[in-house]
Amino acid sequence: MKKLLTFLLVSMLLVFCALPAGAATRWELGAAEREKLDTFFSNFAEARIGSFVVNNEIPMETFVQFGVQHNLINRNYDLVNLDINHSGVKKEAVEAAVYKYFGQRINAVSTSQYKLENGLFAVLKLGGESVRFAQIEDWNSTGKDAWVGIVNVYSASSGFTSVHGTPEEWKREDPQDIPELVARFMFTVTRSPSDADRYVLVDWLEMR
């Protein structure tokens, strides 16, 4: 699997560097579009999911990790309080998140990291974790309702909110609290099957 992902990453890099004229069009994004895409990709960055490609079956581990973490971070109002240290994420909420962001319907099951019991995935409650977010670097249309590009993933201290800022702005705001670039990913997205105004993630390959 690792060798295959490395091969695909190299292939995608070659494609980016040698696209024939007209094969893809680089889009210049306005501020509102950029922030919308930053928010979309931040959902994957904060869930800390690893590389995957559409031509391989996306592991259930990836789907469940995304669904659990997405709900834990963004939908705490829908969590079930299990005990002082643990929350329960509903199975149907995990499946809904996967469909919304990947466009795939799944039947969520237990994984090595998260156990499903009585319709809930038990997970440790959040408490002072670092913030992860993404910013779009490159956005290209293939002309076939698919887009490819690159996002940068940053890590910042708990409570950091200037997720759409630039390094220059961060330095001015607080020189002691500048987000760290921790990863870069190449991606492919397509239109959502349920909402033409939304995207779903197809490929997600870390650049090493």
Predicted stretch roles:
Residues A24-V131:
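Core segments of small alpha/beta cavity-forming domains
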Residues D197-Y199:
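Beta-strand initiation motifs
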Residues L5-T6, K36-D38, V64, A183, ...:
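Intrinsically disordered, low-complexity segments enriched in glycine/proline and serine/threonine
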Residues L126-E137, L201-E206:
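A broad structural signal for short, well-ordered beta-strand segments within beta-sheet-rich domains
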Residues F133-D195:
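Exposed beta-sheet edge and beta->alpha loop/turn motif
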Residues K3-A23:
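Sec-dependent N-terminal signal peptides of Gram-positive bacterial secreted proteins and lipoproteins
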